[in-house]
């Protein structure tokens, strides 16, 4: 189960989790299809303090890598979290597996915000953002989301491939997996 998996991930880096609550922010499966460029896991202790954040990055080849960040007490009380990680996963044929990510996360409350900067040898190579508002999980909100954007997971994959085609047509260097 996902719970067993996340508990093992936390234990591997020495985080005492004690069965606290876990939330994941990811794309939904729609008509049997999903793609999550990034899933963000929020791991809380029994006292409801945020103990760890895991950024799980996926590529279109089915590979994934997790960047697990234990939080100090100061971090857990901060409204904005900043994390850095060395890039470990081949994500794009137009970017090498060098450099690193800088994450800026606002996890609290009714709104959520994530900014990811991929920095290579030449400076910023990519900046991606994701903003969301919390809503109730019920049939009404699910139906509304489906009608509003029925194929959002497919749209994400199409946009990634469209951008790759655009970069390829501009004769950007390609690095193959």
Q: Could you say what each language-model-derived stretch is?
A:
Residues 1-177:
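Mature, function-bearing regions of proteins
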């Amino acid at each position: 189960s996902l719970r067993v998996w996340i508990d093992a991930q936390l234990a591997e880096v020495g985080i005492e989790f004690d069965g606290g609550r876990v939330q994941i922010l990811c794309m939904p499966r729609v008509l049997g299809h999903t793609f999550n460029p990034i899933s963000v896991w929020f791991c809380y202790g029994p006292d409801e303090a945020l103990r760890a954040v895991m950024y799980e990055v996926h590529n279109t080849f089915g590979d994934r890598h997790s960047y697990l960040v234990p939080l100090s007490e100061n971090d857990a009380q901060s409204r904005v979290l900043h994390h850095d990680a060395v890039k470990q996963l081949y994500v794009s044929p137009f970017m090498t597996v060098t450099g690193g990510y800088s994450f800026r996360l606002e996890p609290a409350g009714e709104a959520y915000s994530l900014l990811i900067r991929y920095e290579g040898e030449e400076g910023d190579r990519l900046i991606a953002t994701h903003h969301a508002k919390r809503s109730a999980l019920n049939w009404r909100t699910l139906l509304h989301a489906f009608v509003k954007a029925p194929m959002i997971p497919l749209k994400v994959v199409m946009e990634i491939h469209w951008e790759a085609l655009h970069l390829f047509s501009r004769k950007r260097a390609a690095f193959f997996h």
